[in-house]
């Protein structure tokens, strides 16, 4: 979990969801250690960006870490997370809640690039479509700034 320590701190995120009209989003995120785990808590605006908490860890350090996500809507999801060099990746765990384009879930991933000085993360959430959920498009970009 040591490689994730560079994410620890308080962050402000800004992005925009492509819809009519476009929806600007704002997120306050706090990333901290809890023993051998990492906890991410977020407060989002507008209301469509639900407040959430995620608990990361439990796998050997050489493997992707499970990320258990819970939000104010009652949604719970299992993601996997890695940090390789400056690239932070989060993706839905294989088979987790994905039942094709008409199912209750959807395939989703985050890719973020951490700046050399560690003060910004240029990121985007992507959504998988198609019968296998493997045709990727940008769901929304979001950039984080260390407070």
Annotated model-derived regions:
Residues 1-10:
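N-terminal helix-cap/turn-to-beta initiation motif at the start of protein domains
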Residues 9, 62-63, 118:
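A short, compositionally biased
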Residues 13-109:
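Central antiparallel beta-sheet cores of small beta-barrel/beta-sandwich binding domains
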